[in-house]
């Protein structure tokens, strides 16, 4: 029996393109993708899509997520928006383009208190982030209770992965700065 892997990368709101393609695949195979793939991997926006699929959401639901929530996650287009002043005061000239407050609230609303280990092995979920202080990748695995971060809420795993430098501030888990 083949071991099927789905790998999803970042791209901000362009994640809707991947979600629409996956919704089409889901229709074609007439099966939820969390039952079709053995391992789902994601980084940045791909981590949000991957976590959605791994927790049993349909790809149509994920498309709707992007349609209705992206404007609150990315609330303005210009670096010179007045909404950005608090970020500039906090971080100076290297301030990220967006605050992560809305991203956090939206993902908490989607994933609630679900922890990474709650997903388990069917399918396995792997999310990639980066420790900006230690300069090492952080690999979140849903199937490894012996590894760190298993009890981290899924929303926080996704925020860590989506905290791309220049777009969102780095996210801290256990005092480690992760982007």
Predicted regions and their residues:
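Patatin-like phospholipase
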Residues: 2-7, 12-107, 141-147, 151-158
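Short secondary-structure junctions and interdomain/linker hinges
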Residues: 73, 114, 164-168
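Active-site gating loop/helix substructures
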Residues: 119-179
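Structural motif corresponding to the C-terminal cap of alpha-helices
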Residues: 25-29, 111, 162, 166
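Surface-exposed acidic, glycine-flexible loop patches that form ligand/cofactor-binding
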Residues: 29-34, 108-123
């Amino acid at each position: 029996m083949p071991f099927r892997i789905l790998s999803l990368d970042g791209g901000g709101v362009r994640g809707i393109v991947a979600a629409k393609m996956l919704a089409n695949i889901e229709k074609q195979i007439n099966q939820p993708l969390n039952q079709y793939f053995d391992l789902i991997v994601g980084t940045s926006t791909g981590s949000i899509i991957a976590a959605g699929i791994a927790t049993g959401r349909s790809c149509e639901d994920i498309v709707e997520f992007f349609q209705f929530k992206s404007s609150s996650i990315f609330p303005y287009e210009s670096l010179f928006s007045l909404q950005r002043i608090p970020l500039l005061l906090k971080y100076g000239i290297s301030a990220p383009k967006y605050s992560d407050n809305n991203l956090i609230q939206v993902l908490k609303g989607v994933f609630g208190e679900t922890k990474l280990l709650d997903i388990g092995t069917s399918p396995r979920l792997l999310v990639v982030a980066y420790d900006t202080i230690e300069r090492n990748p952080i690999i979140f695995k849903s199937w490894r209770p012996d590894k760190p971060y298993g009890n981290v809420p899924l929303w926080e795993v996704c925020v860590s992965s989506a905290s791309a430098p220049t777009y969102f501030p780095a996210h801290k888990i256990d005092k480690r700065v992760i982007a």
